Amino acid sequence: MNKIIYLTLLLSCFSSFAQITGKITDTNKKPLSFVSVYLDKSITGTTSNDSGNYELTIKKTGEYIIVFQFLGYKTVKKNISVKSFPYTLNVSLEDEEIRLDEFSIKTKENPANMIIRNAIDNKNNNTDKFKEYTSNFYSRGLFKVKNAPEKILGRSLGDLGGGLDTTRTGIIYLSETVSEITFQKRPRRFKEKILASKVSGSDNGISFNRAQEVNFDFYNNAVLIAENNLVSPIADEAFSFYTFKLEGSFYDKNAKLISKVKVTPKQVGGRVFSGYIYIVEDDWAIYGIDLFTNGKQVGIPIINELRFKQNYNYSAINNALIKISQTIDFKFGLFGFNVNGRFSAGYSNYNFKPNFTKQTFTKEVLAFTEGATKKDTDFWNQLRPVPLTKEELKDYKTKDSIKMVRESKPYLDSINKIQNKVNFLSPILGYTYQNSFKKWSLSFDGLIEDFSFNTVQGFHSSLGVSYFKRQNDKGKWWSAGLDVAYGLSDKKARPTFYYSRKWNNISKPRFYLSGGITTAQFNGRNPIKKLDNLIRSLTRRLNYIKIYEKEFVRIGYSEEIRNGVYFSSSLEYANRKPLFNTTNYSFARQSRNDPYTSNNPLEPDNFTSSVFTEHKIATLNVGATFIFGQNYLSYPDRKFNVSESKLPSLNVNYRKTFGADNSEFNADLITASLKQDVKAGNYGEFFYHFRGGMFLKNKNIAFMDNLQVKGNQMFVVTDDNRRNNFGLLEYYRFYTNNRYTEAHFEHNFNGYLLRKIPLINKLNFHLVTGIKGLFMWDKKPYYEYSIGMDNIGFGKWRVLRVDYVKSNFNGVKIDGFLFGLTF
């Protein structure tokens, strides 16, 4: 073992000096970043950093030909004789001479169209040349801010991890990742194993630099960016979205003719790119990418610009052009907080004949090797293919020092001392006392948190206290709390308590126990928000919410028992009591508005009797959710599930009510739901949701135990789950103790249709259409049809949606407009 360690150290020391180093500039002595540097006849090597410096590691002294390649500049080959290390080689690159040859000028057809058409026709042939491979991947992420504000919306930003200087300028995020990636074209699969990961100023070392997240393939018809599909310049339907112009051509190091084609969108604001694509003549493969887009086009308005650059190199092994480097530069800003960033990536050590087995690709698409986030500085100095700039090196050193200080007990205590100060708003807004070093906190819920109004309790709120203890950094914690709600009109206090525990972040097993006295909506799916009911009651005398009281104790447990299979269960014993209106208060005059209705959901004019009688009952729920095809990321001590499945998710639940005072209330119910978001490429996104239920025996059960749907009687919809709700259906009109099915379909075109209409396309609105249906065994079918506009707003503020909805029930048709916020 000692010999192995010694040999490893010896090789590491040798390799640290086996380097060719230097600086790359243009003819004006300006540093060139991300220039590809490699040995002739090889595919990959290294790249230069933002200062133009590079380090190329070779195994021994001797004669070498070093290639310097950068899009827009002439490729340079340097013959050198290396007799000792380190060897210094500085290089100056000249601008590429782009020229139009005579044939291109004389031809009647737009030569760029011919080039793009050939590139489209040869996509499959070119990508089949690297349909399977493994490679090494290195990435670096960098966020920089200039003149950052001290506060946003009244909240202090602090020093953002210690990266800001006195002008509040500096690096706020710096990370590096080294990994092995495995790729297969058919069926399309991708796998990554993290060998080393580092984040400046962080202990866990977990970065955002996933290879799959930046695997932007312009051979595909659609390039997925932030869950939005942008049309590739060589997509099958590219000519419907772009015009092309041949800027000129040049010869590469292999005497291949490279055409530089300008890409211009036909419609402004669509899911498109602008810039240049470089195509190799005869092969019709991509030689390089220099394309940009903006936040409006990718659906993230705060992004000002997003630029992609990709460099390719020829591989003689498979006679193909292979991506060897990529940069993604971006700018975004909000509330005066402006950030410039770059994610750079390099690919090396390609193997185009891997030996894949059935075990190669699983649902685990990312994993960390042991100790990947704990590598020390010496390790990174040996492994890092692209040298750090002076600014980056300083950031690592500064934040590592700051991190040690900020994890110490004196520092954490001093921060808590400031955070734990009580002010005059604490009773209203809430207050938390923290002990960060011992990892616990004590919180007080302010009066405003649960403040609301209904005609049973009147104005009501609650006071609560809770304790939270984090037991380790692997997701183990426990929490307990006590809450007392009080209504000013019914003058009744309702105390509740809870205890909850979680053991880890892998399967996320969670246990909870709760009990006390509370109020609940008759529809257990809670279709009415407290805030909505407060506003409508006080301004229009529309008291939609109907509630009952229950004294209860509940115990529950949930866990992901295997990947994509989530188990949940609960057992409750409750005494349910009817409640009645105790107040007629409203800001709205009764003479100008309809009077309040009773708390009886079926008889709005019955103020003296309820829809049910007081009773005791036990309720058992056992359910499972199946997310088919779920991929996941295995981070150290935690598992992240990826919601990118092309398959639907299924939820099945069994509910048994038993032990009731009235045996008719005892019943067995099975419910199931199936839903999916279907990405339709450039045509938008399609959503469907089916939900149904069936009682095993038809009985005269308590009203709140009936199958019910989520209706809506508000013209302003604040429910972010609107796709699963009906838009014009009265809250308590449809219920059953037998069986029912509901279906929801919605298609958001994401601008696909509207961007084809002149002037309208400048608004960047999204057309949305939908249809919903409800089918209950004892009622006629109910239907809703809708058409609307999403993404309404201006600039970076696009949070409004408007729908026109029309319903049809037994020949009776109702219509109306719904306004909603889509944060």
Where is each model-derived feature located?
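Short loop/turn motifs that connect adjacent beta-strands in outer-membrane beta-barrel proteins
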Residues: 127-130, 255, 423-425, 429-442, ...
